[in-house]
Amino acid sequence: EWKNQNDDIEQIELIHRPNIYLFQPDGYVNFSEINNGFYMYDNSVFENYLTEKGFINYDGFRSNYFSTLTSNSSLFMMKHHYYFFKPERADQFNYRKHIITENTVLSILKNNNYQTHYIVENPYILASVPALGYDTVNISYDEFGPLYQWGEPVHDVYEDFVTQINQDPSTPQFYFVEFYKPAHVSVSKNGSKGKEKEREQWIDQLKEANNLLVNLVDTVLEKDPDALIIILGDHGGYVGFDYTKQIKTKTLDRDLIYSAFSTQLSILWPSEKLKQSSPEIKSSVNVFRHLFLNLAEDSKYTKHLEPNESWNIVLDEQEKGIYKYIGENGEIDMSKLDDR
């Protein structure tokens, strides 16, 4: 089965067990792209802030899949799913359970005595009401109905995070804080304001995301100076598209492809030793394998890294299928996944 690891990494024993903070801004494109292509935005103030705090910014980093659900399910399972080889039905699979119910990352954390907390802006990931694998979540199922699509209730993730942080200092903590800024251009053609207006809106929301991230990071460093902090986008902002569903029309345009798949990764390691031993991290699917092997000081787990490839669904009538859009080394690659 696709979820099974090729080694015993679920039994890995971490030598270093800092509190781990995963902050995920939706649709945050990588610093290496934001000055270029369709974005053309100077984000140096925030980039310099992270550098001054000691973060490593991983240039060229990208997601392996095009959406929040498809990307995060691969992130937390630490494996490729290839949209389950079903391009027409990919949106129907229950990716949510791989994010918040049961996954490899949660198993490893719990095996190392971590308490786990999920703090999110709205119930989008909770919408299918899966069982919770996290010890706590900031939104109650009583707050929304079974037919929830998008919107209310909206929680202030900063306030909820401040309430939750450091409640039990006796055991290591993992916090996954997810918020939907800067987000991406409109999903549908009918909702689009046109690519230029969509870009302007994305930049406005980027500024809000930067402010929130600064507040989150500053709060952590004040309360927990030995923290491990990860800023990890789920996918790109799709700036340059009129609407996100255009990604399912085949394109060879490098800047459009990277606008969808490029995403930010910045890590503040809890010690200079761990910072110096930080590996090169290229894509979402391998983030936690790299993280855990560094905390365990055990390089044997590099033998089963997943391919750093980005995969897309194409729904063009004549070319329908699942395509590798970006190859191992960042090259544009239009190889079609064999039908299975």
Language model: regions and residue ranges:
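Metal-dependent active-site segment of extracytoplasmic phospho-/sulfohydrolases and closely related
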Residues: 209-249
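A short acidic-Thr-Gly-centered motif at the start of a beta-strand
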Residues: 5-16, 221-223
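Catalytic-adjacent loop/helix segments of enzymes that bind and process anionic phosphate/sulfate esters
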Residues: 83-220, 261-264, 275, 279-288, ...
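Beta-strand elements within well-structured catalytic alpha/beta cores of enzymes
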Residues: 14-34, 50-53, 109, 173-179, ...
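A structural signal for short, well-ordered beta-strand segments and their strand-loop junctions
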Residues: 22, 57-60, 115-121, 175-176, ...
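His/Cys-centered metal/cofactor-coordination and adjacent catalytic loops
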Residues: 18, 29-112, 282
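Transmembrane and membrane-interface helices of multi-pass
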Residues: 1-2
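Short, solvent-exposed loop/turn segments at secondary-structure junctions
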Residues: 25-30, 55-56, 63-66, 80-82, ...
